[in-house]
Amino acid sequence: MPEAPETKRRDASGRRWDTWDDVQRDPLLRELPFKIETNQHGQVVMSPPPGFPHSLRQPRIARLLEDHLSGGYVVTECPVKTAKGTKGLDVGWFSSERRAKIGDSSQSPVAPEICVEILSPSNTEAEMDEKRALYFEAGAEEVWLCSTEGDMRFLEADGEQTTSQRAPDFPDQIDV
């Protein structure tokens, strides 16, 4: 009887991954100074590390979320499973109910209710449009975008809002 074909994905160097756990365990990937995500084909996609302003805004946004929302969990660098691979969310907020359903998975099978992307100069509008759509498809209620100047945009599936529905007093500018 012939052997079954290999089911794991291979990159150009022949390295293989089948799950996000495989990506996390890969010793070569752990040493790279890049943000790592996967695409819909299971291939690893690397981005340059974020710049200093991004690194300053990320914890500020996380603290502000904790200040403006209670009864949930704020996460940073959260791997979220989407229809087009695992995406690394900059900041997110899970309700206690949603968090309880996730368990101890190495990636979240559902998006947090609030997903925040902090833009870097390397991000394109098309890339952010796609991520926004993927987060909504994965269960996000709101997607927030923080521009390179710190301007906040609050989006729901049906369009942009002037404020967040869950955190209406959240500032529309994140200064650093």
Where are the predicted features?
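Gly/Pro/Ser/Thr-rich low-complexity, intrinsically disordered segments predominantly at protein N-termini
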Residues: 1-176
